[in-house]
């Protein structure tokens, strides 16, 4: 990952808060767009989607400022580590809490999502292995290689 010149400052905390807020807004607006479209409100859906794209770009600004965008290998490793934390810790902890509070259906959902996150981690690690094995050469499908004259 890149260098984070804000490490350990209030500004770093603010950047993470801004990134989280913009990321959450993007997802909410995407969900809202689906509801509006299903109800026949095409213009409202389009506005939600346009705003969601704006929020994505805002989030990217803060993510880049935090030094979190690396090269493909770094991004794959970062993604794999995040997925690992989700399936080994976060969702298991949440499932246990839900069970203790009597929300067994939700606990099962947490564990189901954890299983998917495990597959995500495995996929990212396999891709990382492939990228590292290729070195600095990007993958080009055979059809693209043949057309390079």
Segments (PLM) and residue ranges:
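Non-heme di-metal
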Residues: 1-149
């Amino acid at each position: 990952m890149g260098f984070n010149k804000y490490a350990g400052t209030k500004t770093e905390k603010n950047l993470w808060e801004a990134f989280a807020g913009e990321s959450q807004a993007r997802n909410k607006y995407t969900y809202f767009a689906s509801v509006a479209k299903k109800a026949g409100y095409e213009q409202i859906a389009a506005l939600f989607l346009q705003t969601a794209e704006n929020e994505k770009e805002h989030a990217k600004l803060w993510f880049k400022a935090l030094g979190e965008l690396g090269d493909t290998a770094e991004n794959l490793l970062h993604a794999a580590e995040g997925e690992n934390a989700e399936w080994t810790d976060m969702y298991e902890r949440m499932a246990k809490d839900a069970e203790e509070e009597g929300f067994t259906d939700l606990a099962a959902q947490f564990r189901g999502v954890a299983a998917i996150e495990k597959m995500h981690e495995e996929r990212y690690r396999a891709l990382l292995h492939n990228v590292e094995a290729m070195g600095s050469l990007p993958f080009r499908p055979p059809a693209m290689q043949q057309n390079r004259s």
